[in-house]
Amino acid sequence: MQLEHLPEEFEMARPVLQTIEQAGYEAYFVGGSVRDTILGKEIHDVDIATSAYPDEIKHLFKRTVDTGIEHGTVMILDHGTGYETTTFRSESTYTDFRRPDQVTFVRSLAEDLKRRDFTINALAMKEDGTVIDLFDGLADLKHRQIRAVGDPQERFHEDALRMMRAVRFASQLNFTIVPETLAAMTSHAELLRKIAVERTQVELLKLLTGQAPQQGLTDLLTTGLWQYCPDFADHKVDLERLTAQLHQGASTDLTAWTLLTTSFGLETNAITTFLKHWKTANQTISAVQMTTKMAQHLLQGSLSTWQVYQCGEDQLMIANEAAVVLGATDRSRELVAQWQNLPIQTKKALAVTGRDLMQAGVQPGPQLGAILGDLEYQVVTGKLPNEKPALVAAVTD
């Protein structure tokens, strides 16, 4: 196969390949950018594989950065955008089920491609658009299926994260995992325990925000991988229910987390524990506590003016999206109108400050904050106008 019209990202990177080839080495575009171009999807960056060793690459270009020199990766900066260029390599055993114990640089493209995870990712492309397909990846793209390169048992024993990548790709691409690969995932599922949670988290979120999350979640359940995701063990029924309800991907990572925590029926403290086990940031935990609480309210009815104010517009939309997936009526227009009609949308918009109240005779201290909080509530709920004289009078009279 030869692609006639290459995306701009490839065109801009052509001089890099040409420079390497003119020096007598091989160089190809590889990986997801090749796959996605064939599928007609947008690409964002390109990766280059070459027979040139890192030191040889550094002699060919004026500006380079060692981004992963021990694995043969050098960033080339000569042509504006940085291009990651990695030497063809073969890999030894993987005693930690994630990273090879030893990397050996080789001159063979075939040796390099056979160590990759799936056939659809083991495609290479020359700078003129000619696709090199040594493992029938083009056929698997045509049939919309995910197949491990070579022996799937070996691929997943080498790197257990590949199993999560498989279910992620099933969702992102709306592809089916072939039976032999799926069976190997089932027999190796327990190895997911060996993988850092942060790595698993990335794949889970990509699954939940993909175009076909039902496919990815079904594979997660079928293979047993779900059991080795933090705090999923007691929620098989909840996951099965969510799988049946989630017809399209979550719009954001926060929505994805909200779907899980709401489906699992988690309250504030349990959400903290759950998300800490998933190694999420404190800011994410706070946001998900709010969106989950509001999604639970929306599943039971509407939100009060005060709840709308507390949540904020962006988080309201996340809570509504999650609630709709789980069976609630879509209240997005109603919620936006409620938000826009609030007397104030932030505490800073309150017509009085602590200084104003102290000048009116209120003593400083904890009670001052409590008074301001009460005034904020009264204004938001329409019991007091957001006018300085009225608010001062409400405190001093």
UniProtKB/Swiss-Prot annotation:
Membrane-crossing ranges are: none
Instruction: Give the reaction(s) catalysed.
Output: a tRNA precursor + 2 CTP + ATP = a tRNA with a 3' CCA end + 3 diphosphate; a tRNA with a 3' CCA end + 2 CTP + ATP = a tRNA with a 3' CCACCA end + 3 diphosphate
Keyword hit for Secreted = no
Binding positions for Mg(2+) per the UniProt entry: 45, 47
Binding-site positions, CTP = 32, 35, 116, 159, 162, 165, 168
Per its UniProt record, the required cofactor names are:
Mg(2+)
E.C. code: 2.7.7.72
Matches recorded under CDD domains: NT_ClassII-CCAase
InterPro entries in the record? Bact_CCA-adding_enz_type3_sf, CCA-adding_enz_C, CCA-adding_enz_firmicutes, NT_sf, PolA_pol_head_dom, PolyA_RNA-bd
Q: Tell me which Pfam families the record gives.
A: PolyA_pol (PF01743), PolyA_pol_RNAbd (PF12627), tRNA_NucTran2_2 (PF13735)
Q: Which UniProt keywords apply?
A: ATP-binding, Magnesium, Metal-binding, Nucleotide-binding, Nucleotidyltransferase, RNA repair, RNA-binding, Transferase, tRNA processing
GO annotations under biological process? RNA repair; tRNA 3'-terminal CCA addition
**Annotated ATP binding sites:** 32, 35, 116, 159, 162, 165, 168
Entry's Gene Ontology molecular function annotations:
ATP binding; CCA tRNA nucleotidyltransferase activity; magnesium ion binding; tRNA binding
What's its job?
Catalyzes the addition and repair of the essential 3'-terminal CCA sequence in tRNAs without using a nucleic acid template. Adds these three nucleotides in the order of C, C, and A to the tRNA nucleotide-73, using CTP and ATP as substrates and producing inorganic pyrophosphate. tRNA 3'-terminal CCA addition is required both for tRNA processing and repair. Also involved in tRNA surveillance by mediating tandem CCA addition to generate a CCACCA at the 3' terminus of unstable tRNAs. While stable tRNAs receive only 3'-terminal CCA, unstable tRNAs are marked with CCACCA and rapidly degraded.
Q: What else is known?
A: A single active site specifically recognizes both ATP and CTP and is responsible for their addition.
Give the family, as the similarity comment puts it: Belongs to the tRNA nucleotidyltransferase/poly(A) polymerase family. Bacterial CCA-adding enzyme type 3 subfamily.
Assembly and interaction partners: Homodimer.
Q: What is this protein called?
A: CCA-adding enzyme
What gene name does this entry carry? cca
